[in-house]
A protein has these predicted regions:
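Short, polar/acidic, helix-capping and beta-turn segments at strand->helix junctions
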Residues: 1-153
């Protein structure tokens, strides 16, 4: 177990197997040292995390859903790196989509659940640029979907 996975273990996190795509696309594409990971939905061990922020879900629950997405992103990175998460050099950028009402404005605070988790788990390598975008609906009614760009070695 490498450094990043040791840190995750200390946080009580074990990465799941990388989720299979839900439609006709690949989970990631590597170009040189850049890894582009498809959107990961808020699906944890207990199933889909569904809801609409500003309606039946609050920002704190949305942040937890975003953390679940970040865990799935790391699982995809690990798979792309042949099982060696320490090949990850840095998180470059996240794009977070938040299933939210038209008048909900706390998308950034919701996606902080992913950003805070990655910073804690990966340290300096977890700092990234980011967008947080409102969506009228997301696949399967999930609360959050996040895609990521990573640099690997």
């Amino acid at each position: 177990m490498g450094q990043f996975e040791n840190t995750l273990a200390q946080m009580g996190i074990t990465l799941p197997d990388a989720p299979a795509p839900a439609a006709n696309y690949v989970p990631y594409v590597q170009v040189g040292d850049m890894l582009y990971v498809s959107g990961q939905i808020s699906k944890g061990g207990d199933g889909l995390i569904v809801g609409k922020l500003g309606d039946d879900m609050d920002t704190a629950a949305g942040a937890e859903a975003a953390k679940v997405c970040a865990i799935a992103l790391l699982a995809q990175v690990k798979a792309a790196c042949g099982g060696d998460l320490d090949r990850l050099q840095r998180v470059v950028k996240l794009t977070g989509f938040v299933n939210s009402t038209a008048d909900y404005t706390e998308q950034p605070q919701g996606i902080n659940g992913a950003s805070d988790f990655l910073g804690e788990a990966l340290g300096e390598a977890g700092k990234h640029s980011r967008s947080a975008v409102s969506a009228a609906a997301l696949p399967f009614g999930v609360a959050v979907e996040i895609e990521g760009i990573f640099q690997i070695k």
